[in-house]
Amino acid sequence: MSMPFELIPALSLKAKVVNSKPLKKGDAVGYGAEYHAPNDGYLITIPIGHSDGYPFNGSGMRALVADGQIGHIVGGVAMDQSMIFVTNPVAVGTTVTLIGRVGDQSITMQDLAEHTQSSIVALMNDFAPRLQRIIVS
């Protein structure tokens, strides 16, 4: 549908890496050790989980790392944190984008809704008050 105006995304969800550790091919992580690393890489942890409103079934979603890497959430989304598998090392403190744009890559609320078989409205309503809101003009 054509609009008489441009729509600009008005929301992003970002977190800083709090832990980063190397993984070897076949290493298992997550609830029930259900995820096995497909190759050598790194497991980074961010402090956003389903108690923040990020969907419990968000495992497999892309995550955009500030250094240009694209990772995937693995091992299930925990209550207060999520783990992301990446190929190259990532420093603690690096920004990870779960919703938003980094360079020419983006993850939208629609992407998350489709992946989790939910709706944008339901996802928005689930975001917890403890998530910091920054209003920009």
Can you annotate each of these PLM segments?
Residues M1-S137:
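Active-site anion/phosphate-binding pocket segments in diverse small-molecule metabolic enzymes
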